[in-house]
């Protein structure tokens, strides 16, 4: 795609029509370069058309769509329960957050009650997912700025979280563990001990990361004062998540629009004031500490609740227990029809939003009364947050683009869908 075509898609970006152009009266000559779509710092398949005056960024045009998979359209041909597996593959670094947003929207359509044990388990697992996602961000962000040790340390702890996910669901990343009405399976033996072991070591590990970076003069030089954005511009651009909270706006859906009983948990919303790369780093580091605290509270609640149902008792939604399937022909028929034909929510629409590691993630579903959704749309935070990149990049060096992209933490599977 040419620069002119990209400019036509976004008229706010004044890109020149040629690779180089003569300087007009009173301005300097600029040059247009492609960054990506195969550049390692773009954290996926992202192309940036960068207009430069020397090494100074005049403007940036993100060119997306290289990872488009048609997930939203594909979901229209799946039953509601089968479509869960597709939600894993949008933001593939936080699949449980996508599972949660989707199943909450379907449960709204159905008016479904979820057992308390399943709700608490959802909170615990999505907070572990938040930590795992932030560890990927921290490691790759540090690696982009030549801090390799942090990358290795962060992935060390992420492995422990992925081991927990594997214990629970059998999969390390594409878990598909949340189901409409509850969970796919009950929490296994050894889950409590595995989570407790991780929560014991994680605060000390965060201290290690901060000791390596927070007061590091090279890290400060590459992040402080770079890519700053104020709260007014952030809100106007639709920025959410750590990027918005780094501007001083304490907006977190877990507090402002609670779901899954988050209003009953004790945690703070970390904020900063300058809105630059360094503040976005500080906010995410503080968020990991808060997530550890939420996990501790949720784990204690699971202990207090004890064994119990993990799926709704509504047999129009939930499959019969396996013990019944082996004894009852009616249960076997019901199981077969539920997975082949699916349940049928009433006509209507529903929206469910959650606070994913990258910001506000919402799922909007339209039901026509059939067993398959008429329309599914994701409000993907990576997609919306990416439009703030030109605003943050103007006036900085081209080398700062690498750090800027990392500070937004985009996942291109979620951007392109």
UniProtKB/Swiss-Prot annotation:
It catalyses: a quinone + NADH + 5 H(+)(in) = a quinol + NAD(+) + 4 H(+)(out). InterPro entries: NADH_Q_OxRdtase_suD, NADH_UbQ_OxRdtase_49kDa_CS, NDH1_su_D/H, NiFe-Hase_large. The keyword Transmembrane does not apply. Gene3D superfamilies: Cytochrome-c3 Hydrogenase, chain B. It is a peripheral membrane protein. Its EC number is 7.1.1.-. Keywords: Cell membrane, Membrane, NAD, Quinone, Translocase, Transport, Ubiquinone. NDH-1 shuttles electrons from NADH, via FMN and iron-sulfur (Fe-S) centers, to quinones in the respiratory chain. The immediate electron acceptor for the enzyme in this species is believed to be ubiquinone. Couples the redox reaction to proton translocation (for every two electrons transferred, four hydrogen ions are translocated across the cytoplasmic membrane), and thus conserves the redox energy in a proton gradient. It comes from Roseiflexus sp. (strain RS-1). It is found in: Cell membrane. GO terms for cellular component: plasma membrane. Belongs to the complex I 49 kDa subunit family. NDH-1 is composed of 14 different subunits. Subunits NuoB, C, D, E, F, and G constitute the peripheral sector of the complex. It comes from the Bacteria. This is NADH-quinone oxidoreductase subunit D 2. HAMAP family: NDH1_NuoD (MF_01358). The gene is nuoD2. NCBIfam families: NuoD, PRK06075.1.
